[in-house]
């Protein structure tokens, strides 16, 4: 049963949890409680992930806070159950965080979690896709942030296409990645450049605190690039568009 999983960090992770969350550890435990109960029931967290909620999810995400400047506005794209955006809001009360999520059942969970954790002053939830948030399409108000975060969303080229327009000029995309980070940078650096991004950099967060450290790819938005225009439809021999 989901409720049988403890929300407190296991003894071997207690020091890391205190280091990353400080005096807001009790708030992190409350969030963990939501994830291993309601999050599992509603299909946002897999049952097998619940016992590993601290090492694979909460600590993994909290370590990224070291890459985010003080007082930043953060847009978390494809937030899902709030990873990493809600974790960052818990760990860093100086941040202003917007959780961007297209699916209704996930946004419903996020809205409830923000209310239960009493984070409404620093966290808002927006239902929509990154492309809509950037352009204001679909009736969604356009938004930008100093930092755009994303976790396990897509390959780097697509991620940059979706997320870089959400960063203010001079802002950055911080994408949580795994062992493929270096290969993705080598493969997609040219595309990132065409999208107005700087050279992607790989960083390892939480070294000496979490094991293994959290790997992120960081891309600065150096230039504003106009979005590509859609190609016109081809005409058939009869003159009709196809």
Curated annotation (Swiss-Prot):
Q: Which SUPFAM superfamilies match?
A: S-adenosyl-L-methionine-dependent methyltransferases
Q: Tell me the keywords, alphabetical order.
A: Cytoplasm, Methyltransferase, rRNA processing, S-adenosyl-L-methionine, Transferase
Q: Name one GO cellular component term.
A: cytosol
Instruction: From the Swiss-Prot or TrEMBL record, state where the protein is found.
Output: Cytoplasm
Top-rank EC class of the record's enzyme: transferase
Source organism, top-level taxon: Bacteria
Q: Which InterPro entries match?
A: rRNA_ssu_MeTfrase_G, SAM-dependent_MTases_sf
Its EC number(s): 2.1.1.-
The residues that hold S-adenosyl-L-methionine are: 78, 83, 130-131, 151
Does the record bear DNA-binding in its keywords? no
Task: Write one Gene Ontology MF term.
Answer: rRNA (guanine-N7-)-methyltransferase activity
Q: Does the keyword Secreted apply?
A: no
Protein's job: Specifically methylates the N7 position of guanine in position 518 of 16S rRNA.
Give the family per the record: Belongs to the methyltransferase superfamily. RNA methyltransferase RsmG family.
Read off the NCBIfam families from this record. Answer: rsmG_gidB (TIGR00138)
Could you tell me what this protein is called? Ribosomal RNA small subunit methyltransferase G
Origin species, per record, is: Salinispora tropica (strain ATCC BAA-916 / DSM 44818 / JCM 13857 / NBRC 105044 / CNB-440)
| Encoding gene, per UniProt annotation | rsmG
């Amino acid at each position: 049963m989901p409720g049988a999983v403890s929300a407190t960090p296991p003894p071997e992770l207690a020091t890391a949890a205190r280091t990353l969350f400080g005096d807001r550890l009790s708030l992190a435990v409350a969030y963990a409680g939501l994830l291993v109960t309601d999050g599992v029931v509603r299909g946002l967290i897999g049952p097998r992930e619940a016992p590993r909620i601290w090492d694979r999810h909460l600590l993994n995400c909290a370590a990224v806070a070291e890459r985010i400047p003080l007082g930043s506005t953060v847009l978390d794209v494809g937030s899902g159950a709030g990873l990493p955006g809600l974790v960052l809001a818990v760990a860093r009360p100086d941040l202003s965080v917007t959780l961007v999520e297209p699916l209704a059942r996930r946004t419903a969970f996020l809205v409830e979690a923000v209310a239960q954790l009493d984070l409404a002053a620093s966290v808002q939830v927006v239902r929509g896709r990154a492309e809509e948030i950037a352009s204001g399409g679909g009736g969604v108000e356009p938004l930008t942030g100093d930092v755009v975060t994303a976790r396990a969303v897509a390959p780097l080229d697509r991620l940059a296409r979706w997320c870089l327009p959400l960063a203010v000029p001079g802002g950055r995309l911080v994408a949580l990645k795994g062992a493929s980070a270096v290969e993705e940078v080598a493969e997609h650096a040219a595309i990132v450049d065409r999208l107005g991004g700087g050279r992607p950099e790989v960083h390892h967060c939480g070294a000496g605190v979490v094991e293994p450290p959290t790997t992120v790819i960081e891309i600065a938005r150096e230039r504003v690039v106009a979005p590509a225009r859609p190609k016109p439809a081809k005409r058939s021999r009869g003159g009709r568009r196809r």
